[in-house]
């Protein structure tokens, strides 16, 4: 098990050094400021990581634009029934979305909302996913398809 953890750790470190992973920001905020899509930031090697204070992180995530965020969690914390001491990076989408009508659906929805016939609005959600792999307690690789968000956008 120690060899598996060492290999997985080495692989993660190598991916971070090659710009394939995500690294922490000293301030605990998204590295790129301004209006960027999560795909643009990911292609540029950017980072979205928050602070260790969950409530502050949640407030910041919900008040900012729709973007990709990361949490480092144990596999058990995912709540999917897997036994493993491994840590994985779980990426998710959070933030606000403008109510601008960019599509025919958006135009119709805005009109219906103005009439009080429809409720809600665009929501921040994943537009692309990635698989997550880890070594379980029986030394078997487990692959969880489409577990982690890879890009975010506003939909609805």
Curated annotation (Swiss-Prot):
GO terms for molecular function: glial cell-derived neurotrophic factor receptor binding; growth factor activity; receptor tyrosine kinase binding; signaling receptor binding. SMART domains: TGFB. Disulfide bonds join 66-124, 93-152, 97-154. Keywords: Disulfide bond, Growth factor, Secreted, Signal. GO terms for cellular component: extracellular region; extracellular space. One of its GO terms (biological process) is peripheral nervous system development. InterPro entries: Cystine-knot_cytokine (IPR029034), GDNF_fam (IPR043401), TGF-b_C (IPR001839). CDD domains: TGF_beta_Persephin. Homodimer; disulfide-linked. Interacts with GFRA4 coreceptor and RET: forms a 2:2:2 ternary complex composed of PSPN ligand, GFRA4 and RET receptor. Belongs to the TGF-beta family. GDNF subfamily. Growth factor that exhibits neurotrophic activity on mesencephalic dopaminergic and motor neurons. Acts by binding to its coreceptor, GFRA4, leading to autophosphorylation and activation of the RET receptor. This is Persephin.
């Amino acid at each position: 098990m120690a060899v598996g953890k060492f290999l997985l750790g080495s692989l993660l470190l190598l991916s971070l050094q090659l710009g394939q992973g995500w690294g922490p920001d000293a301030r605990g905020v998204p590295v790129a400021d301004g209006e960027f899509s999560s795909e643009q930031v990911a292609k540029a090697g950017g980072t979205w990581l928050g602070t260790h204070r969950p409530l502050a992180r949640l407030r910041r995530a919900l008040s900012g634009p729709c973007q990709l965020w990361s949490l480092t969690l144990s596999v058990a914390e995912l709540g999917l029934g897997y036994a493993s001491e491994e840590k994985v990076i779980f990426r998710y989408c959070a933030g606000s979305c403008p109510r601008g009508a960019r599509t025919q659906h958006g135009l119709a929805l805005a009109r219906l909302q103005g009439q009080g016939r429809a409720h809600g609005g665009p929501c921040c959600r994943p537009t692309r996913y990635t698989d997550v792999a880890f070594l379980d307690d029986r030394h078997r690789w487990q692959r969880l398809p489409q577990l982690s968000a890879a890009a975010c956008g506003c939909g609805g």
